[in-house]
């Protein structure tokens, strides 16, 4: 299977969907290739309240509207895994597990995913009460109490934010502590953590599964072999100019795959 497009967008998250809307509306023949599900990581967010013009929605609803909008302008979508990119020539080729596709231009929009800490049960319970949290203070709006596990002797964030966390009556901070394991069957029921200095282990259990584990250990870019030949920084994020162009002609970057300070839906689009 081999087809020719004006532009191929790799990644069906907010950045890829926004690019598809604009490309398709400009009457470019557009293909969006997404490995897992259209919408990206934001689809597991039940409440989005900071997207301009939308008072409140879910991540799934927001990206579904983006997809429908792109489709209304003629964009095509393909659920497939992009395995290889050939970007040097005037005609670009994207090899997937469902065939090879050609285009005059390619937009890399694979995004970034939360970095895994490596405790037992992390992969099994991802998406079932797991999310990245920018700060513990935000969680106190919804939780009766928040316990923060810090691997080192202190926070590495700005002192003003750290002080606010330390003073908060709903937050307990445990330093030199690492999460070892979570589990419980269909839902999260227990967590085991260890003091890195003393080796003492603590098992926290709840009979009614009324707790969650929120992992915030930064992000890692998604790219791998697809970014071969493209300039990236030391962490693997795509280097682009002010117009989102990469070091190769006809290849652009969009969204969280690119170097940026803030990773939100509104900055991705």
Regions found by a protein language model. Give the residues of each.
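A Rossmann-like FAD-binding core segment of flavoenzymes
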Residues: 70-95, 101-103, 140-242
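Phosphate-coordination loops involved in phosphoryl transfer and adenosine-cofactor binding
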Residues: 4-6, 79-80, 176, 248
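Short amphipathic alpha-helical segments
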Residues: 20-22, 44, 118-122, 137-138, ...
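Short, hinge-like loop/turn segments at secondary-structure boundaries
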Residues: 48-52, 125-126, 164-167
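Beta1-alpha1 glycine-rich phosphate/pyrophosphate-binding loop at the start
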Residues: 3-73, 133-158, 174, 233
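FAD-site-proximal beta/loop scaffold in flavoenzymes
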Residues: 113, 118, 123-130, 215-267
């Amino acid at each position: 299977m081999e087809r020719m497009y004006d532009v191929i967008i790799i990644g069906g998250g907010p950045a890829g969907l926004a690019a598809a809307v604009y490309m398709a509306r400009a009457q470019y023949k557009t293909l969006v290739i997404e490995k897992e599900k259209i919408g990206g990581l934001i689809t597991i967010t039940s409440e989005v309240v900071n997207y301009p013009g939308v008072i409140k929605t879910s991540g799934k609803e927001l990206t579904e509207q983006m997809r429908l909008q792109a489709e209304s302008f003629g964009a095509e979508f393909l659920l497939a895994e992009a395995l290889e990119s050939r970007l040097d020539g005037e005609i670009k080729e994207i090899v997937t597990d469902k065939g090879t596709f050609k285009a005059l231009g390619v937009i890399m929009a694979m995004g970034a995913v939360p970095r895994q800490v490596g405790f037992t049960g992390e992969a099994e319970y991802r998406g079932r009460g797991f999310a990245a949290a920018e700060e513990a203070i935000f969680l106190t709006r919804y939780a009766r109490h928040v316990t923060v596990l810090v691997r080192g002797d202190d926070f590495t964030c700005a002192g003003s934010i750290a002080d606010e966390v330390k003073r908060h009556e709903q937050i307990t901070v445990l330093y030199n502590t690492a999460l070892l394991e979570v589990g419980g069957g269909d839902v999260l029921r227990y967590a085991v953590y260890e003091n890195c200095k003393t080796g003492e282990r603590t098992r926290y259990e709840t009979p009614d599964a009324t707790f969650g584990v929120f992992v915030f250990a930064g992000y890692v870019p998604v790219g791998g072999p697809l970014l071969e030949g493209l300039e990236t920084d030391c962490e693997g994020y795509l280097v682009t100019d002010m117009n989102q162009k990469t070091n190769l002609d006809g290849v652009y970057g969009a969204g969280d795959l690119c170097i940026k300070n803030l990773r939100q839906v509104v900055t991705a689009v």
